[in-house]
Amino acid sequence: MYFTDESSPAMNRVGKKRNRLSFVCQACRKAKTKCDQEKPRCGRCTKQNLFCIYDVARQAAPRNPNKDATIARLKKEIRYWRNKTVDLTQEKKDFYTALKRPTEELAARRTCKSLQENSFPISLYKTHPRLIMTKVMKREINPLSEKYLIFQDTFLKTLIASVLLSCSRNSMIPALNADISRSRTQPCVKNNVVKMREVLLKNSKYESQRKSINEFTDRLLQRKNPEEQIAVNKVISLLYSNRESSYLEDTCPTENDYSDLLKGYINEIEKTLPPKAIIEQYLSHFFEHIFHLIPFASKEMLEESIHTTVQYNELGEVRLSMGTTLIRNKMENLCILLLILRIAYISLTFIEDKIEDYSPYITKEMLEQYPIQSEVIFLAQQILASENWCACANENTISCLLYIWCAFVFSPTEGDFLLEQPSDVIINLVILIGTSIGLHRDPSDFPALNHPEASDKRLLNLRRIQWLSIISMATLESSLKGRLLVSPLSMIDLFIDVRDPNCVEIYKKRVKKDLTGSESDEQLLEIHEIFFHRAQLALFLSDLNNITISYSGSVPMDTLETLRVKANELLKNKFQLRSVDINIYDEEKTFQKLTFNSILNSISLSGQILGKLMMLRASIALMLYFETLAMERSECLSFFYKYFFQCCADTISLIRFFFLYFNGSYEKVLSSLVCFITTKVIQLAVPTTMFTLLVIIMRVELAKNMLLVKCNECNARGDISDLPEIKEKIKSLDTIKENFERLLLEVYLLASQNLRFKYFYIFKMLTLFDVFIQRLRKGQLFSGLFVKVDKDLTTKKIATMLELTLGINLDKSDHLIDRLKGKNLTVNFTLDQLYQIIKEFDRIKNIGVADPQNSLNPSKPNMKDNTPTIELLLNSSVENESVPPYSSSNDPTNVGNASTYSLAHNISNQNNEENMPPSIGSSESNRAAPNLNFMPINNNYNNSGSNINNNDNVKLPSNFKNYYDPPMSSLDISMDVPDIFGSLDFFDYDLLFQND
């Protein structure tokens, strides 16, 4: 081959870049297609629902532009806009003419406009990428994850950063500057945690609370507790056996020929299992109250195996009789026995005292004397690993893995599984093993399973409900974490066509065909039906999650709305709570029906809360998305309001569930013995709810402040025509703000009393909210954002951390208020829109936050109980003194002395007596918390100065230029709550403060 001059390397130099302006839109330019240059959107972008952006002004202009060409182009643009103005003017005339005499053409035009709005393109994942990065980890934050709001919302990020930057009162910053890998090396951290523990222990009421306090404070100080450090190791132990290389045998010539491995496991199981009477009591409780919630095994087959295998000596101690055949099957059923005993124990630990009032089988002394420790999980996993379960899987293996997942998820002592812990590993293992044994196909597809001599007929429906459970658990978990589960629909496509409108009836026919004729067949059919509906709900939520993290392109808005409507209809029609008519002539049957309905109601209530939680997260993501777009495109403002309102409505719906659950309204349809599942679901929903309340409150407060400034400016100019509407808006915003503040304080109190000492995750999150609530009571939740930051005292490490995680740039902090004003579109809402939000409060107006006479569980502390919370530190030095409750200056809400509004501020009474709210009588009759009294719109704002002829300006406090807020109780204390927060790694969001 010969090289010519044209192909020589000398000719491969990069030529000069030509600076030519492109007048077509970006989408057409990238696609290299013709653009009609129509404004504001070209024809191609309009047709394909693409974003149409003309970036002529942003392009680098040529060095020597051609003047004649520029003049010609400008003249062409003038002609274009002149013609467009004429056309629009004519359209306007036609519009008003059509208003007087409606035509079919106008109706068609309106329909077209509505369709165009519904097909508005949405691209959440592509336009809002977020990767949190530290030296030891990286994590992507997706739109439906819990942390998306924290890292995407400017208001919330700023609030959190303002807490972290309070160096003078916060011990977190010094701890970070030093050795952050060992928090106990910081004296300020250790001293505050020790002081916190002493006060909490002193005020604790139950032994379980004292145990949790010691455990949680040890975690804060990073003290190693072997029992708590093996949770991850237990999951890993599924994959290997720490015994020997050989596996368990399935048959043996005689019992004397057992392998050493089998003998060792037999001895361990005999030592682990409690006496006969205790086992029977635990099993009775499990099968009566819990089994139908998690029916991952066949009750009859399990009981038959246990009856054959588990024998007892004269003292009632367990002695195993394994026989010589089917040894592995018997060991697998023993593993199931160990796991369900552990789950039964977990469910009973949620009742603080007087267990005898709820369970006829278990007593408090029995729990204390024969606890089922978490070591049984490790033992069961070791037995499975010794069977080489990956290669020799069966239905029993699936049952064990599913019960292991449940034991981790629902146990508050095993870490925060289902949030960021390795329950992902377990459920994905279950999917792999389930597909390997054909669970993803209906059992009727396999002739071998239907052979009467080769297989047990009871396995057919067991396999069905196992696969439905796997689908539900895997898709719900991935959706809650905002992650993508690979093809969840393909997991069920071979099982049944869920798109068929009659799919439920088809599935029920299959189940009926394979029923065995036992007494429990009717209940089994109902369980299969509600599990099928739960799988449908999980698939809807998974579709919603998958759409929000789709990178392939934009999605029409109506696609998201259709999924929301379908999920809401399913929740409304198939997840309603059931009641039972009491039959005094057949008490036993009535009791059984009550118990079974309680189980179904637990599934329904959990499904409603999870469904509404995912709807709220979707609303949050869309609200933030349209908030950004509306700053550039005015037509998006209506969409922003739509999802802002939806956030308010979904939040109120979730809070309604919280109130009804904790005040005992569900006690007739929901047993306390199944509350461990519902409480876990509420734990998942509380953080998102509380953070959303903060976001709404700050936006509404800023909007009110901006309108107050506008009101003053109108008075100064003498322009009084708009004053009535502005003042009416201020009243409405004030109503919304104060009502949401009440909700935030009540949810905070409920979480403190019922969840703080059950879940370490909530314990740490509420420690952060202790700071927020303290600011809220002072009236500084919003104004505290604008405290001047001394950049000289802020280390580069802290500044970098804030920028990489929260996206806060301290160099631009001087323009913070301008950025927040620019982001706040709430000020543009109309009066009708504000009234619509206020109307939502009617849904919970008459719901009591706590009712001592009607509590779900008398062991749960009521509002009047002196429940130990970190807030007790605020008044630990002032004992036995009356504490005036929080009161609004216009419409006080009487929630009693122990409510959130009445926590201590006595230390500053002498110096701030003139600012104190009026005290409510301290008689016993005033201490019970009645219903919430939300403020009506006409009671929030003083109209005495709202005369349109009055040109006096509204008075603003000096701590914020345009700040106005009704007075809240003063709280100047000798010991700051932020010092306690200083020991935390940001409530388990280790992506913020991770050890180096």
Curated annotation (Swiss-Prot):
PROSITE patterns in the record: ZN2_CY6_FUNGAL_1 (PS00463), ZN2_CY6_FUNGAL_2 (PS50048)
Name of a matching Pfam family: Zn_clus
Region annotation (Disordered) ranges: 879-929
GO CC terms: nucleus; Pip2-Oaf1 complex; transcription regulator complex
Motif (9aaTAD): 985-993
Keywords of the record: Activator, DNA-binding, Metal-binding, Nucleus, Transcription, Transcription regulation, Zinc
Induction trigger: Autoregulated. Induced upon growth on fatty acids.
Subcellular location: Nucleus
CDD domains linked to this entry: fungal_TF_MHR (cd12148), GAL4 (cd00067)
Superkingdom of the organism of origin: Eukaryota
DNA-binding region: 25-52
Residues forming coiled coils: none
GO BP: any one term: positive regulation of fatty acid beta-oxidation
Biased composition (Polar residues): 879-928
GO molecular-function terms, A-Z: DNA binding; DNA-binding transcription activator activity, RNA polymerase II-specific; DNA-binding transcription factor activity, RNA polymerase II-specific; zinc ion binding
Domain notes for this protein: The 9aaTAD motif (residues 985 to 993) is a transactivation domain present in a large number of yeast and animal transcription factors.
Function of the protein: The PIP2-OAF1 heterodimer acts as a transcriptional activator to induce the transcription of genes encoding proteins involved in fatty acid beta-oxidation, a response called oleic acid induction, when cells grow on fatty acids as sole carbon source. Recognizes and binds to the oleate response element (ORE) (or peroxisome box), two inverted CGG triplets spaced by 14 to 18 intervening nucleotides, in the promoter region of a number of genes (such as CTA1, FOX1 to FOX3, FAA2, PAS8, PAS10, etc.) for peroxisomal proteins. Activity is inhibited by OAF1 under non-inducing conditions.
Subunit and partners: Heterodimer of PIP2 and OAF1.
Protein name listed in UniProt: Peroxisome proliferation transcriptional regulator
Organism whose genome encodes this protein: Saccharomyces cerevisiae (strain ATCC 204508 / S288c)
